[in-house]
């Protein structure tokens, strides 16, 4: 199997696990994998947009644990829908480049 296909299968599996367990509003892949330049040693940068009760950091850690063993390093960042709206045009936030250069992997039907 080609490396690109294998990477895509792993990313698809990460999305499936996140959607199944956490019901996010949206998942965006950004960084080198979204640009198509990431290798197996590059982490998959995932912006997970979801409602959170409590700590977003704790939610990101829980998601990271749910993705254990997928076979690719990853960096999970959890933001709320309100933060996306508030910071979508603010340069210097992680939301800004993720929305502009990222690839939407999942979006919950309205």
Language-model regions: role of each:
Residues 32:
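A contiguous binding-surface segment within folded domains or other stable secondary-structure elements
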Residues 1-26, 35-40, 50-110:
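Catalytic core of pol beta-like nucleotidyltransferases
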Residues 45-49:
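Short beta-strand->loop micro-motif that forms the acidic, two-metal-ion catalytic signature
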């Amino acid at each position: 199997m080609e490396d690109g296909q294998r990477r895509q299968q792993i990313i698809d599996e990460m999305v499936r696990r996140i959607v199944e367990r956490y019901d996010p509003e949206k998942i965006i892949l950004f960084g080198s994998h979204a640009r198509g330049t990431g290798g197996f040693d590059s982490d998959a940068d995932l912006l997970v947009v979801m409602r959170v009760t409590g700590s977003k950091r704790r939610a990101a850690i829980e998601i990271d644990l749910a993705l254990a063993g997928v076979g690719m390093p990853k960096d999970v960042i959890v933001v709320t829908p309100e933060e996306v709206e508030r910071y979508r045009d603010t340069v210097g936030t992680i939301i800004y480049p993720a929305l502009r250069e990222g690839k939407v992997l999942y979006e919950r039907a309205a």
